[in-house]
Amino acid sequence: MEFYDVIQQRRSIRKFKTDAIPQEKLGRILEAGRLAPSWANKQCWRFILVEDASMRKRLNEVMNGNPGATVYEDAPITLVICADPSNSGKKDNKEYYMLDIGIVTEHIMLAICAEGLGACWVGRFDERPIKNLLNIPEEYRAVAVIPIGFPDEQPDPKPRKELNTLLYQDQWKVQE
């Protein structure tokens, strides 16, 4: 799939077929994440690939109460992306690990789409039960949870703002 086609076609998928994901596809997706740029090349991320059905069920249970939790039920794989904030930059009151995780997660999300798969990036959850379940070390943050699978839905595109409402030329200007 061409790059700009991937960007235009990517959607948040919340319904999945239960078909297994070929390892070659999964390998390319994870490689896309591995190659993501990061602050000072620190690569503060770590990935937990949850394939075991009973572990995915337990993950779904600890996500209970999250409005996005139901997306895990049929996805054959869930990827949890973690970050070590101390292994990324902090400058001028900005913590760069969140930017690093945003970049690596978007690389992964686009690769998922390019492979003909679907995913939903879930970022709102209580991380303590997830850390306990997956034995994530205390210094790491669980930042993103991504169920992955073959889509069992084709959502329409969400409305996007027009570029001319987002872009300023040379300096910020008040819209009239």
Spell out what each predicted region is.
Residues 11, 54, 125-128:
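Alpha-helix/helix-capping structural signal
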Residues 67-74, 78, 135-157:
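A glycine-rich helix N-cap at a beta->alpha junction
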Residues 83, 123-124, 150:
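Short secondary-structure boundary segments
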Residues 5-13, 18, 22, 144-176:
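C-terminal helix-cap and adjacent tail motif
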Residues 1-3:
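Absolute protein N-terminus
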Residues 33-34, 79, 91-133:
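Small-aliphatic-rich amphipathic alpha-helix that forms the alpha element of a beta-alpha
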Residues 27, 31, 38-104:
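Glycine/small-residue-rich phosphate/adenosyl-binding loop
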